[in-house]
Amino acid sequence: MPGTIPLIGEKFPEMEVVTQHGKIKLPDYFKGKYWVLFSHPADFTPVCTTEFVAFAKRYEDFKKLNTELIGLSVDSNFSHIKWIEWIKEKLGVEIPFPIMADPRGTVASKLGMLHAASSTHTVRAVFVIDPNGIIRAIIYYPLDNGRNIDEILRLVKAIQITDKYGRATPANWPNNELIGDSVIVPPAGTVKEAEERLKKYKCFDWWFCYEEGVVPKEEVEEVRKWLERAAKLQK
């Protein structure tokens, strides 16, 4: 039976996994870094191939965010090796990050990545883990629909903004329809705090205040470039 999905805010479970880069102990292998774990249904499949190419082409963008990547499927290590060799030979793209081999589905089951109706295919999932090994985000995608890698980049950046500045990011940040690239101030816990925030920040009301200029402009523009790239690719 598939395992229970770990919850956001919980510690990523300790495990030793096999990859084409050798054995890796998680989460210690990425200690001090953010990392994105993404599972895919199977090697040598069209949608998964497009995703791996997209992740590889954006790998340097992730590294700029102090973020590493690691894939996972219930394929064997040999299958992973042959698949990434095929991608390099046929598509001219080298896959620089490790891919977990989980042919028995042990890891996938532990992380809740096996569909209830199938024990032979991992679902298309994304886990974002912070430098302390805490799961910060979990996203699932349909079998037939590939992930938007630039949106995953944006999500990682948004999580880092929360960690660094103690602020929340609005919908479509940094291009929010109401407050642009500003960030949201956490709601006040007392009447006094609410009154003070109305004086200190721009507010629509006491419970909805925001702060301008928190994130450096160059960082904002970098995120906008990712989103513009994604929009151009969709045309």
Swiss-Prot record:
Keyword field contains Cytoplasm: yes
PROSITE patterns cross-referenced by the UniProt entry: THIOREDOXIN_2
Reaction catalysed by this enzyme: a hydroperoxide + [thioredoxin]-dithiol = an alcohol + [thioredoxin]-disulfide + H2O
UniProt xrefs under InterPro entries: AhpC/TSA (IPR000866), Peroxiredoxin (IPR050217), Peroxiredoxin_AhpC-typ (IPR024706), Peroxiredoxin_C (IPR019479), Peroxiredoxin_TDXH (IPR022915), PRX_1cys (IPR045020), Thioredoxin-like_sf (IPR036249), Thioredoxin_domain (IPR013766)
EC number: 1.11.1.24
SUPFAM superfamilies listed in its UniProt record: Thioredoxin-like
Chief localization: cytoplasm
Sequence positions that bind substrate: R124
Catalytic site: C48
GO terms, molecular function: thioredoxin peroxidase activity
Subcellular location: Cytoplasm
EC class (word): oxidoreductase
Record keywords: Antioxidant, Cytoplasm, Disulfide bond, Oxidoreductase, Peroxidase, Redox-active center
A GO biological-process term: cellular response to stress
Name of a matching Pfam family: AhpC-TSA
Disulfide-bonded cysteines: C203-C209
Assigned GO CC terms: cytosol
Keyword hit for Disulfide bond: yes
Domain Thioredoxin intervals: 6-161
Misc. comment: The active site is a conserved redox-active cysteine residue, the peroxidatic cysteine (C(P)), which makes the nucleophilic attack on the peroxide substrate. The peroxide oxidizes the C(P)-SH to cysteine sulfenic acid (C(P)-SOH), which then reacts with another cysteine residue, the resolving cysteine (C(R)), to form a disulfide bridge. The disulfide is subsequently reduced by an appropriate electron donor to complete the catalytic cycle.
Family: Belongs to the peroxiredoxin family. Prx6 subfamily.
Record function comment: Thiol-specific peroxidase that catalyzes the reduction of hydrogen peroxide and organic hydroperoxides to water and alcohols, respectively. Plays a role in cell protection against oxidative stress by detoxifying peroxides.
Subunit description: Homodecamer. Pentamer of dimers that assemble into a ring structure.
Record protein name field: Peroxiredoxin
